Amino acid sequence: MTPPGDPIDAVIGGHSGLPFTQTLGSRLWHKPGAIGMPANDGTPRGWYSILAAEDGGIDIALHALDYDHAAAAGALRAVNPDLPYAETFETGLWPNMDVMPESERRERGRPTAPGSVLWPEERIAAAE
């Protein structure tokens, strides 16, 4: 745990729903999405990231995970037919966006693209 007052270099969230990578000055904010929940982008894919040390920095690669979403939806309906997330596995759209900011609501149904970002060495050094 970082002591109060010490700078934070990077924040990496987990099971975060909406995948993205953002640099804020020398700092990094990364959310890999979730393997068990589509990204509200109209595709049934889950998401994960691989972080790897590279010459010049840290490579952060965002990957889509295709899986048997129809079987997952069927299994969910078998145990809880009233839970709306079975449809989410099929459509890639969340049943509720009440807690989402308007900017993220507008992105609903727009497919997320896999990609890679290099967090450069000089930004890492500046954050130390």
Indicate residue ranges for each PLM-predicted region:
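Conserved catalytic scaffold of divalent metal-dependent phosphoesterases
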Residues: 1-10
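Active-site neighborhood of phospho(di)ester-bond hydrolases with catalytic His/Asp-centered motifs
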Residues: 9-15, 30-33
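Acidic, His/Gly-rich catalytic cores of divalent-metal-dependent hydrolytic chemistry
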Residues: 23-128
